[in-house]
Amino acid sequence: MADIYRFPKFSYEDNGTVEPLPLRTGPDKKAIPHIRIVKVGDPPKHGVRYLDLLLLGFFETPKQTASLGSVSDLTEHTGYSICGSGSLPIGVAKYHGSDQELLKACTDLRITVRRTVRAGEMIVYMVDSIGAPLLPWSGRLRQGMIFNANKVALAPQCLPVDKDIRFRVVFVNGTSLGAITIAKIPKTLADLALPNSISVNLLVTLKTGIPTEQKGVLPVLDDQGEKKLNFMVHLGLIRRKVGKIYSVEYCKSKIERMRLIFSLGLIGGISFHVQVTGTLSKTFMSQLAWKRAVCFPLMDVNPHMNLVIWAASVEITDVDAVFQPAIPRDFRYYPNVVAKNIGRIRKL
């Protein structure tokens, strides 16, 4: 059984909403490109800004149609067939141009895609035709990029391995960063286990503008019967001296003194940002890698939910601090389905 502290609404009402991407089609029945920029922190209104970009679009393969014309018609591709949707995260860079120039440069990119496998399925992106507005990101674009297939493709099993695949950019998600950075809590600190400690986790409840059941993300009903989604992130540990008693009021007072502010960004799809504006103990600060602002991309926390809602409207409706006993050190973590060193199973 866990104890819960609900944060006041003002802690997330200013930047806790993301507007949807407008899904409109032109006369050719193709989606009209659109760029969506949200602000996290207090970025400058004009001039140079730091932008994190995520390119959204469709995976396509060339198709051939039966033709009764000349022989040359039989060898010419007349169009492309969509075989899936996905994204390409290209990271943060300093940018001083306009949003529309950036959108045009992104949609003009020629991106080829290959599905492969290492320890898990991967998507390989190779990029050409990098325009001037994208030069700040060119170092990463020119090198080629590899991502976990389940994080960047909605249905990687639909991408053929025996055909050429291109990625056509239609939408651009941008996060304009101010004082808040996109620092992440290192995995070693997030997995930290300390004796005599209480784990502080955040339960984030969202409302989205699309039905998600058919895509495998089941909502939960709140007290008013509304459908909501939620996910959890780990913030840190509260530790007291041996012999001291943990009380709910003590944990709540520690959290209240932090004066946390929450916001939504578009890093990796949908991202959850936490900023500490109050006092923070040295122990807790060290667990946040000495950062007062941290980012939790939903792409890492819950990849499938992220794939389903990354183009929809998303709104924070509640944020709860969940106080749970820290997992003991002697508990073993099993990341693999196959247990090691049991019976005939041996680690290679």
Swiss-Prot record:
Pfam families: Matrix_Paramyxo_C, Matrix_Paramyxo_N. A large portion is phosphorylated in the cytoplasm, but not in virion. However, this phosphorylation is not essential for virus replication. Disulfide bonds: none annotated. A motif (YLDL motif) lies at residues 50-53. Keywords: Host cell membrane, Host cytoplasm, Host membrane, Host-virus interaction, Membrane, Phosphoprotein, Viral budding, Viral budding via the host ESCRT complexes, Viral matrix protein, Viral release from host cell, Virion. One of its GO terms (molecular function) is structural constituent of virion. The modification Phosphoserine is found at S70. It is a peripheral membrane protein. Its main location: virion. One of its GO terms (cellular component) is membrane. It is found in: Virion; Host cytoplasm; Host cell membrane. GO terms for biological process: viral budding via host ESCRT complex. Plays a crucial role in virion assembly and budding. Forms a shell at the inner face of the plasma membrane and concentrates the HN and F glycoproteins. Acts as a negative regulator for transcription and replication by sticking to the nucleocapsid. This effect might be regulated by the cytoplasmic interaction with tubulin that dissociates the M protein from the nucleocapsid. Belongs to the morbillivirus/respirovirus/rubulavirus M protein family. Late-budding domains (L domains) are short sequence motifs essential for viral particle budding. They recruit proteins of the host ESCRT machinery (Endosomal Sorting Complex Required for Transport) or ESCRT-associated proteins. The matrix protein contains one L domain: a YLDL motif. Homomultimer. Binds to the cytoplasmic regions of F and HN proteins. Interacts with nucleocapsid. Interacts with human alpha-tubulin and beta-tubulin. Interacts with host ANP32B. This is Matrix protein.
